[in-house]
Amino acid sequence: LCEMIAKMKDRNNHITIPGFYDDVIELSNEERDDIARAPFSLDEYKKALDLSDVHGEEGYTTMERTGIRPTLDVNGIWGGYIGEGAKTVIPSKAYAKISMRLVPNQSDKEITKLFTNYFTSIAPKSVKVKVSPHHGGEPYVSPTDTPAYTAASHAMETTYGKKPVPVRSGGSIPIVALFEKELGVKSILLGFGLDSDAIHSPNEHYGIFNYFKGIETIVYFFKKYSDLLKAK
């Protein structure tokens, strides 16, 4: 199992599943420059994660790897006897939980199919492979040329006194793509938390300052959005 998983990436951390990148849209240099405008300290990033260095897909920065590039990650692996003490058993089964973060234009159903076919094909003939899909979500990127984005940018600048920089994030909010599919509307995502808030971690927290600033921003957003729609 470990050997099979290792074959899923090459030495440049490029995912080796045939067809995995076929629908990935490469960003222009201008778009990559826009991403680089966002405040980010690699040293602080490494310090927060207690790392001496970072690694990932060659040719991309850490911000790009976490925001615009698809990934394949092993979330857990186990098998055989894992209790206290020792038992000289030969494991008959081994398991791994694997997730893939997708980017716009990729399909979770298609990627699941490609993964299943490839993972099965690289298995030794002496073993059986069972892939059990759990759930998936379509990737989404909010457009920055809509009245909603203009209103959001204005609201953030009014509240915080600085023009916001749009960023792409690898977080999963599957319902956003579903909104567009079912309702035919674009979504805009406003974030008020900080990287240091440790979202989904044991010590997750959210500052009162940003809580109230968020309320203030939402008021400015709806006021500006309403004005823009009336002006059409």
Show where each model-derived region lies.
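Alpha-helical metal-binding/catalytic segments enriched in His/Glu/Asp
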Residues: 1-11, 98, 214-221
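Generic solvent-exposed, charged/amphipathic alpha-helical segments
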Residues: 2, 6, 116-120, 153
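Solvent-exposed residues in well-ordered beta-strands and their adjoining turns
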Residues: 99-103
